[in-house]
Amino acid sequence: MPSFDVVCEANMVEVKNAVEQANKEISTRFDFKGSDARVEQKEGELTAFADDDFKLGQVKDVLLNKMAKRNVDVRFLDYGKVEKISGDKVKQVITIKKGVTGDLGKKIVRMIKDSKIKVQGSIQGDAVRVSGTKRDDLQSVIAMLRKDVSEAPLDFNNFRD
């Protein structure tokens, strides 16, 4: 019985490359001369540091541009609150979303059931497993999900026959 998984996870290699490129551009830009602006990456989160709110916005702008160039969907990013650190400096923690959330998983399963396509959807941890009897049905489910789900970047993997 053919099946596949619907997942929501960023390519962490591309995220790392985007962070490195952003830091390189920030270090060479004239408007950041003498400032301590940078982006750091730790496991599932990024931290943007800058001298003030305006420069923090500039740092995030550079990061988003580099991520877009590396084909990393910016919907993976979840921005935290801007925190003040020593003196005037500020930082912001940006979390990278991983996995299909419970609400989104339920919505995907409901959409699959409402579509009347002869497939079954089940939530398995942070992924949704879709299985059916025909490959064509699975392909039509993929097309439907790509068209209708816009709040999260979905990937389809683990195809089995």
From Swiss-Prot:
Name listed for the protein in its UniProt record: Nucleotide-binding protein Reut_A2760
Keyword list, A-Z: Nucleotide-binding
Family assignment from sequence similarity: Belongs to the YajQ family.
Superkingdom, natural source: Bacteria
UniProt GO MF annotations: nucleotide binding
NCBIfam families in alphabetical order: PRK05412.1
Organism whose genome encodes this protein: Cupriavidus pinatubonensis (strain JMP 134 / LMG 1197)
UniProt function note: Nucleotide-binding protein.
InterPro entries the record matches: DUF520, UPF0234-like_C, UPF0234_N, YajQ-like_sf
CC terms in the record's Gene Ontology section: cytosol
Pfam family, one: DUF520
UniProt xrefs under HAMAP family: YajQ
